[in-house]
């Protein structure tokens, strides 16, 4: 998101996610002083919804699954002129997550025996 133009950032961003991506977009938006709408399936666990809201994201619960939420996010993006922040199929998103493994090694004060990675879409896993 840091690579987006000031014009885009002034409008805010939108994403569809049921978990980690939603939290990442909300936190990034807060850090970069813009707004984020996160469309999440109605089946999303309440703890994840609360986390996104706690990070400043506006949550819209829609649909029974990710595909339905994603389609709604696309509709809202067109209506409001917002940039969609995709969870995995974007070179900037992939590059941003590409530093995860390196950051773990740099920040660890001890040798690492194992790393446990939560897997939703799987993008974080490929960078470890």
Spans of model-derived segments:
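PLP-dependent amino-acid enzyme catalytic core
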Residues: 1-126
């Amino acid at each position: 998101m840091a690579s987006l133009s000031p014009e885009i950032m002034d409008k805010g961003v939108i994403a569809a996610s049921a978990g980690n991506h939603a939290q990442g977009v909300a936190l990034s938006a807060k850090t970069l002083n813009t707004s984020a709408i996160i469309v999440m399936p109605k089946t999303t666990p309440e703890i994840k919804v609360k986390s996104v809201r706690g990070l400043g994201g506006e949550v819209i619960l829609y649909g029974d699954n990710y595909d339905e939420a994603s389609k709604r996010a696309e509709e809202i993006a067109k209506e409001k002129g917002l940039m969609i922040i995709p969870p995995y199929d974007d070179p900037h998103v992939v590059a941003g997550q590409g530093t995860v493994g390196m950051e773990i090694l740099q920040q660890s004060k001890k040798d690492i025996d194992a790393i446990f990675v939560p897997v939703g879409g799987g993008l974080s896993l490929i960078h470890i």
